[in-house]
């Protein structure tokens, strides 16, 4: 199988309250230095954003649960994400869902200023 992608919206009364974008690719295709034998499908959570006025209503948990379930259906045994260093609210949320910091970091310059990010991973 090739790459798979999904984009979800959480909507209430025609208002978008949250978004989640995730994908899976065989053998860590976007990171050859971390390739795994046998073409293992690896999930990647690209974004999970909740309207600040909707925080604490279970929307993030519902979107995350759906993403993790979809990863499993796609045959992923693990998934990764990148979170901004210092974003303690997001890191805490991810840890509550079972994600763990891996110790890997990167600097993203694609939006102009340097964004320092930490990798998190979860076994499914």
Describe each PLM feature range.
Residues 39-43, 77-80, 84-91, 95-124:
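C-terminal "cap" of GNAT-fold acetyltransferases
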Residues 51-53, 57, 85-86:
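Active-site acidic-Proline motif in GNAT/NAT acetyltransferases
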